């Protein structure tokens, strides 16, 4: 089976003094989360589309789904965890408890606050994850990346054409991700906050799918302005 895991567990502290977590803020008069969910509903390959949100915001999430006529029976809401990977594991726990987990099951995990992903990106994630077990969505780095260990001096400058900026979705064979996560120590779980990094550290290759420059993560007030400009300028592909 193929699952979507929409990661809406953040509280949006970088957004500043706002009344709601960032995933519930509006762009073009509609919550960011709804824009994102609508992209996933269009993909018939998904058996279930699971939203993980803070426990105290589950009722609000269900209310906005009703308000914006998200009636697709594949859409479920579960409680997120204390961090990103725990949120993904909560989704996997839900899958295991409801359907069980088969060897070829795939999960496409995606930031709820990246509302501009395309059908191509989603479908390529599914295809590559089914074939290879793990995939990250990336774009080539445009700017030169510098590394500093003390935040004052440059210590190295990586070769730019080897650098990529990670986006989401990140997609996995569920058993591969679950087993790799369970093999981590508590200390490793604190450090390895990215699911793809967990797979890389396990020794399993992670394939790349081409993202889009406009597949932005809306985390700051500036991002919110950019997101509205993307919609109003009809920049993003369908």
UniProtKB/Swiss-Prot annotation:
Q: Which UniProt keywords apply?
A: Cell wall biogenesis/degradation, Nucleotidyltransferase, Teichoic acid biosynthesis, Transferase
Instruction: Using the UniProt record, name the top-level EC class of this enzyme in a single word.
Output: transferase
Query: Which reactions is this enzyme annotated as catalysing?
Result: D-ribitol 5-phosphate + CTP + H(+) = CDP-L-ribitol + diphosphate
Organism superkingdom = Bacteria
**InterPro entries per UniProt:** IspD/TarI, IspD/TarI_cytidylyltransf_bact, ISPD_synthase_CS, Nucleotide-diphossugar_trans, TarI
Known EC number = 2.7.7.40
For biological process, the GO terms are: cell wall organization; isoprenoid biosynthetic process; poly(ribitol phosphate) teichoic acid biosynthetic process
User: Which residue positions does UniProt flag as site: Positions ribitol 5-phosphate for the nucleophilic attack?
Assistant: 160, 217
Bilayer-crossing residues are none
**Pfam family membership, one:** IspD
Tell me one GO molecular function of this protein: 2-C-methyl-D-erythritol 4-phosphate cytidylyltransferase activity
Per the UniProt record, the site (Transition state stabilizer) maps to: 14, 22
> Pathway membership of this protein?
Cell wall biogenesis; poly(ribitol phosphate) teichoic acid biosynthesis
Q: What residues bind CTP, as annotated?
A: 7-10, 81-87
State the family it belongs to: Belongs to the IspD/TarI cytidylyltransferase family. TarI subfamily.
Known function: Catalyzes the transfer of the cytidylyl group of CTP to D-ribitol 5-phosphate.
Question: In its UniProt entry, what is this protein called?
Answer: Ribitol-5-phosphate cytidylyltransferase 2
Q: Which organism is it from?
A: Staphylococcus aureus (strain MSSA476)
């Amino acid at each position: 089976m193929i699952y979507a895991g929409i990661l809406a567990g953040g509280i949006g502290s970088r957004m500043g003094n706002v009344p709601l977590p960032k995933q519930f803020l509006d762009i073009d008069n509609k919550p960011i989360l709804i824009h994102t969910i609508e992209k996933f509903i269009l993909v018939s390959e998904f058996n279930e589309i699971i939203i993980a949100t803070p426990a105290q915001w589950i009722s609000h999430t269900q209310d906005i789904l009703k308000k914006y006529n998200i009636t697709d029976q594949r859409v479920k809401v579960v409680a997120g965890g204390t961090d990103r990977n725990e949120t993904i594991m909560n989704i996997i726990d839900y899958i295991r408890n409801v359907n069980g987990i088969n060897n070829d099951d795939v999960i496409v995990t995606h930031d709820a606050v990246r509302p501009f992903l395309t059908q191509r990106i989603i479908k390529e994630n599914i295809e590559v994850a089914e074939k290879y077990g793990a995939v990250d969505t990336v774009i080539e780095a445009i700017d030169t990346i510098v590394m500093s260990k003390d935040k004052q001096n440059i210590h190295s400058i990586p070769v730019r054409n080897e650098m990529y900026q990670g986006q989401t979705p990140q997609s996995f064979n569920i058993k591969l991700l679950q087993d790799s996560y369970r093999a981590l120590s508590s200390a490793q779980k604190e450090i390895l906050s990215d699911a793809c990094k967990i797979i890389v550290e396990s020794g399993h290759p992670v394939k790349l799918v081409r993202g889009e420059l406009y597949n932005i993560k809306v985390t700051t007030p500036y991002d919110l302005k950019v997101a509205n400009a993307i919609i109003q300028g009809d920049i993003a592909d369908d």
